[in-house]
Amino acid sequence: MSFRVGFGFDVHQLKAGLDFWLGGIIVPHTKGGLGHSDADVLIHTICDALLGAANLGDIGKHFPDTAAEYKGIDSKILLKEVMVLIRNKGYEIGNIDSTICLQTPKIGPYIPEMKKILAICMDVDVDQISIKATTTEKLSFVGREEGVSAYATVLITNE
């Protein structure tokens, strides 16, 4: 059995009047992520970590923001496609550890639903997914509520 680790990072600007997609759900907020797709920073981060672990490039390579077919796309669809790619190479997820950096809103109450949705998309157990949240203590673009960022580390295995 071999083990591979991947790391992902993503940032999206927050803008008033947009839905705030995070972890596959809409989180109530006055702002939402600005992006070519639905701007789900957590799913994009996980996709990048998985693709990196499997040495398959990054999310931009597979789903370019210049391609019309990805305009406004639900990021859960992208995640499912990434899972096909890594499974085609013989990999399975060991675990995912992620952190969302966001000043507001407090997202703790939404994390269980995010984990459930992500587990369904990836066909893994909820216990294989960790989602944490933190602020930047009002520092940087996150602290000024101009954007949201996320980090993820994944372990994949191949028998």
How would you describe each model-predicted region?
Residues 1-2, 159:
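Short, low-complexity, intrinsically disordered N-terminal peptides in bacterial proteins
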Residues 2-112, 122:
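RNase III-family endoribonuclease catalytic core
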Residues 111-115, 145:
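Short, low-complexity, polybasic intrinsically disordered segments
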Residues 118:
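Glycine-rich, mobile lid/loop segments that gate access to catalytic sites or pores
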Residues 138-140:
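Short acidic, Gly/Pro-enriched loop/turn segments at secondary-structure junctions
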Residues 125-128:
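Short acidic capping loops at alpha-helix termini that bridge into adjacent secondary structure
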Residues 131-135:
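Pyridoxal 5′-phosphate
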Residues 142-159:
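C-terminal edge-of-domain segments
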